[in-house]
């Protein structure tokens, strides 16, 4: 059996490719079923965020398993395999384990140390368990990866003051507005007419960061206006006007800065809509939706500047030098956790031998117990029989304790193989070749 991961991220694919591979929560169940239908895939879990799609699997054969996962990704995205393959990465065994732990710790994120990825890994684990697509191996790996992410954030300063996708989007707006005014620093958003489209988790974070950067009023649009109203109630000190998405064009015309973060699988704003709006001043779009909420063609409009998640790198790079130093400390913690998992996984090699040894000794125990009880005669009470049976079970457990502990203890593969051979030979757990 092999642990593998196949996927793509902001490091390997631009947003126009990633948006075709975004798997919404409502499609996860169907996707997991499709992956489990491959005969080589034993366990599988999907991580889908705005910056990555990664499929972790336990497979019988690593080559055919990886090919099956790639086939699924190509079919799901509708991208021809030869066009898709250059954007995909594949990690196997130790590298796959290390990659997931680094992802969970925020070490592979666009924003080093960002915290949202940890909750996304938790969700991946929950969805895998709910859909029964994960088993003992991936469940152990996911659980330990989540613990690793928590450990890195609690024992290092990597997560301290870390920006998120949402905060980076707000900083990008500050940077671009400042550059237009001839400044190289981040300016206040107090004078901007701000529109936020979408009322989900990312929009909540957007509003939180907008507030901290000087914004004191904004318009909030959502398809479900009740959800927008509920979100607005969490910001009583901000002036938030909530409206339906059907009023989008009208409110764009009143805005100078528009943030979009909806779950729409198609753009909600394109050049045709923009051309219908009488823009009296320049307009900036910051789109953090994946798939993108804003069509790329809006950039053709002379009064519009549009940015997506790939443009956040400009802001992120301003903060990375300090975080890179802290990341070294975090990587050493991740490596420790990787070794712990691999030692546990290697110890599973001993399970069949341990089970056979326990089974053989249990058979002997029952046979000898039955002989002894038959000699005791009818005067031997049921209570006394239970005491004797408990005694024999205790003896077996005591006998097994030391060899089982030794077989499961951390050791090299070569050492474990030698130990297993010795136990098998001493207890006749395998049939010897009669021809020898």
UniProtKB/Swiss-Prot annotation:
Possesses an unusual extended V-shaped dimeric structure with each monomer consisting of three distinct domains arranged along a curved 'spinal' alpha-helix. The N-terminal catalytic domain specifically recognizes the glutamate moiety of the substrate. The second domain is the NADPH-binding domain, and the third C-terminal domain is responsible for dimerization. The record marks 99 as: Important for activity. NADP(+) binds at residues 198-203. GO terms for molecular function: glutamyl-tRNA reductase activity; NADP binding. InterPro entries: 4pyrrol_synth_GluRdtase, 4pyrrol_synth_GluRdtase_dimer, 4pyrrol_synth_GluRdtase_N, GluRdtase_CS, GluRdtase_dimer_dom_sf, GluRdtase_N_sf, NAD(P)-bd_dom_sf, Shikm_DH/Glu-tRNA_Rdtase. It holds the Pfam family GlutR_dimer. It comes from the Bacteria. It comes from Prochlorococcus marinus (strain MIT 9301). Disulfide bonds: none annotated. Catalyzes the NADPH-dependent reduction of glutamyl-tRNA(Glu) to glutamate 1-semialdehyde (GSA). This is Glutamyl-tRNA reductase. Substrate binds at residues 49-52, 109, 114-116, 120. Belongs to the glutamyl-tRNA reductase family. During catalysis, the active site Cys acts as a nucleophile attacking the alpha-carbonyl group of tRNA-bound glutamate with the formation of a thioester intermediate between enzyme and glutamate, and the concomitant release of tRNA(Glu). The thioester intermediate is finally reduced by direct hydride transfer from NADPH, to form the product GSA. Pathway: Porphyrin-containing compound metabolism; protoporphyrin-IX biosynthesis; 5-aminolevulinate from L-glutamyl-tRNA(Glu): step 1/2; Porphyrin-containing compound metabolism; chlorophyll biosynthesis. It catalyses: (S)-4-amino-5-oxopentanoate + tRNA(Glu) + NADP(+) = L-glutamyl-tRNA(Glu) + NADPH + H(+). GO terms for biological process: chlorophyll biosynthetic process; protoporphyrinogen IX biosynthetic process. SUPFAM superfamilies: Glutamyl tRNA-reductase catalytic, N-terminal domain, Glutamyl tRNA-reductase dimerization domain, NAD(P)-binding Rossmann-fold domains. The active site is at residue 50. The gene is hemA. CDD domains: NAD_bind_Glutamyl_tRNA_reduct. Keywords: Chlorophyll biosynthesis, NADP, Oxidoreductase, Porphyrin biosynthesis. Homodimer.
């Amino acid at each position: 059996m092999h642990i593998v991961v196949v996927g793509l991220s902001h490091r390997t694919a631009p947003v126009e490719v990633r948006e075709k591979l975004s798997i919404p929560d409502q499609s996860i169940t169907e996707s997991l079923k499709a992956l489990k239908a491959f005969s080589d895939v034993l366990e599988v879990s999907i991580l889908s965020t705005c910056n990555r799609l990664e499929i972790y699997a336990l497979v019988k054969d690593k080559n055919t398993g990886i090919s099956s996962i790639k086939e699924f990704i190509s079919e799901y995205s509708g991208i021809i395999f030869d066009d898709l393959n250059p954007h995909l990465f594949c990690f196997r065994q130790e590298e796959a384990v290390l990659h997931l732990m680094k992802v969970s710790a925020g070490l592979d994120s666009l924003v080093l140390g960002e915290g949202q990825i940890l909750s996304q890994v938790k969700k991946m684990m929950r969805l895998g368990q709910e859909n029964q697509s994960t088993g003992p191996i991936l469940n152990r790996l996911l659980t330990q990866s989540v613990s690793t992410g928590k450990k890195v954030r609690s024992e290092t300063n990597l997560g301290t003051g870390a920006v998120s996708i949402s905060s980076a989007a707000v900083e990008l707006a500050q940077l671009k507005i400042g550059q237009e005014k001839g400044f190289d620093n981040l300016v206040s958003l107090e004078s901007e007419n701000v529109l936020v489209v979408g009322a989900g988790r990312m929009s909540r974070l957007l509003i939180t960061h907008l507030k901290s950067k000087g914004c004191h009023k904004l318009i909030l649009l959502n398809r479900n206006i009740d959800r927008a109203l509920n979100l607005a109630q969490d910001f009583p000190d901000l002036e938030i006007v909530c409206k339906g998405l059907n009023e989008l064009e009208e409110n764009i015309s009143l805005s100078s800065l528009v943030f979009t973060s909806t779950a729409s699988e198609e753009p909600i704003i394109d050049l045709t809509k923009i051309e219908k709006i009488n823009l009296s001043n320049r307009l900036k779009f910051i789109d953090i939706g994946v798939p993108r909420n804003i069509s790329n063609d809006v950039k053709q409009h002379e009064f519009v500047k549009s940015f997506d998640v790939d443009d956040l790198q400009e802001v992120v790079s301003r903060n990375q030098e300090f975080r890179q130093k802290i990341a070294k400390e975090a990587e050493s913690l991740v490596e420790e956790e990787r070794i712990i998992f691999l030692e546990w996984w290697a110890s599973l090699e001993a399970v069949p031998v341990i089970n056979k040894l326990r089974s053989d000794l249990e058979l002997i125990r029952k046979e000898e117990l039955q002989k002894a009880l038959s000699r005791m005669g009818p005067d031997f009470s049921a209570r006394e029989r239970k005491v004797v049976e408990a005694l024999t079970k205790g003896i077996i457990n005591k006998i097994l304790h030391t060899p089982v502990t030794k077989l499961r203890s951390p050791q090299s593969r070569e050492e474990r193989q030698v130990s297993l051979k010795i136990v098998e030979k001493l207890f006749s757990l395998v049939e010897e070749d009669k021809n020898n």
